[in-house]
Amino acid sequence: MTNEIKATFDVTTLEGRMKILNAKNAGGASLKTCVDGTIIEAVGIAQYQQESDTYGDMKEETVTAIFTADGDVISAISKTVAEAATEIIDLVKEFNLDTFKVKVSKQKSSKGNEFFSLLLVG
């Protein structure tokens, strides 16, 4: 399992390490509880790897944690969320944004499966 953490904030500071620790240990609310179109006022996003046991099958998954302006954490284990969050992290870092808005997008695949994604909105 890799220990790499990708984030919009400095994960080498005490504040950054505390955010990661709290996200890993408390997890916060699930992104699945957000309705389609929910706008999240974010102050940070981080991604880290965790191992999950799915019916005896260990696999490594990317956890995406969104840190809200009011101090909450919203987390997701989703490939589509992780892909979108990776791009959002890059943009937020490139333009040095302290706060930003993320929109939750809930969609259905061609097979009828529901999936989530994230959009960066102004």
UniProtKB/Swiss-Prot annotation:
Q: Which GO terms describe its molecular function?
A: DNA binding
Q: Does the keyword DNA-binding apply?
A: yes
According to the lineage, what is the superkingdom? Viruses
* Record Pfam families: Phi29_Phage_SSB
Q: Which InterPro entries match?
A: Phi29_Phage_SSB
- Relate the assembly described in the record: Monomer.
Q: Which family does it belong to?
A: Belongs to the phi29likevirus single-strand-binding protein family.
Q: What is this protein called?
A: Single-stranded DNA-binding protein
Q: Which species is this record about?
A: Bacillus phage B103
